[in-house]
Amino acid sequence: LSFGPRSIAMWRRVLARCGPVRRLSAAGSAAPAKSYSKGLAGVIAGETKVCTVGMGGDGLHYRGYSIEDLCRACEFEEVAYLLIYGDLPTPAQLKSYRARLNEYRVVPKAVRVMLEHIPLSANPMDVLRSTCSMLGCLRPETGYLSNGGEQSSPTSVSTDDAFTSLIAGFGPALCYWHAFHTSGKRIDTAGSDDESIAAHFLRNLLQTDRISPDKVQTVDLSLILYAEHGFAASTFASRVTTSTRSDVYSAVCSAIGTLRGTLHGGANEAAMELISQFKVDDDIEGGMRKKLANKELIMGFGHRIYKKRDPRSDIIKACSEKLSEAEGGRPDLYAISQRIEKVWLMLEEKKIPPNLDFYTASAYNMCGLPTPFFTPVFVIARTAGWAAHILEERAAGKLIRPSSLYTGPGSRALPAWKQAS
């Protein structure tokens, strides 16, 4: 744009017709502030039929089923189906769903090439985010190819298949990237219809068929426990993106990027780092006292919603204990975790119990997962929950656009040198 003398004169005439400028108050706000809560704490930001967090003070339900019942009676695939479609699958529906998941376990060639170019030094969360973007290019969601132009391509997939490909494909992509850069192997990630996501992931990660049922069960239960948790930051991010009428892959990329942040994801990795600082014979009480005195952030304890207990914690704690007692287990890790918990509850003023992340750390370690993979496994699980919320947000059909409380300066006159011009 060019702003010569004639243009400036024209704009002055336009502004003169607009009337007096509305001045901000001295407090900086042009209107009385509406209800405001930092971090949206306690704010109801939408409706959902997917999950209740904190029912009865410390309960957790997916589509009306308690987390305890689901962990006792279901595998992750059944829970993913429940979250996305609203009901637990019949045996026939589950068989069909497993077959569809298996179709997407082979990593596409273009994705393999990309993964081979992502260095081992990269954050595994960035690997998954990049995988999601690449899959969105290779298999665009039908109806979301372009704005106002062609809405599908020969490689377009349905919304349903887009979700299925992500839930099934994240684990194999992560394992392919890891194997290529640690051993130089281009692994075949094909599976079978009856192989669970947990079993398939461990087989590809550890490169062995000899995996104990206890380890498979632990990872499977963790996927159920991490699958959904209401309007958590990543889920809300996916809903915001969805509300703009964007595609599935963009919404999931938003969620992954949000979960990458250490205040949302990464707590189980931080818990493992804490546990690794001690040995069984160490003065854990003294070490924890020092950390608290230095006001260090202790991850793996407490939750914004659960004030008494995290209902998921006892389930994963039992898995950690069972693994520690098995052949080749790490009883030292479980013992150290127990002592840290005991000391924390003794020293911490509010007596906040451990959350899901704390005992997940030792459980994942005993399953053979590298610590940087803890949060990516969270992604594999939570993609099912994100899918449910994306579908729900699309049905709502309203753009999420909250207001903000202005705290900047009040109205100011232009500097003298600008007035003169």
Where are these predicted regions, by residue range?
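N-terminal mitochondrial targeting presequence
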Residues: 1-31
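Hydrophobic alpha-helical bundle cores within soluble ligand-binding/oligomerization subdomains
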Residues: 26-421
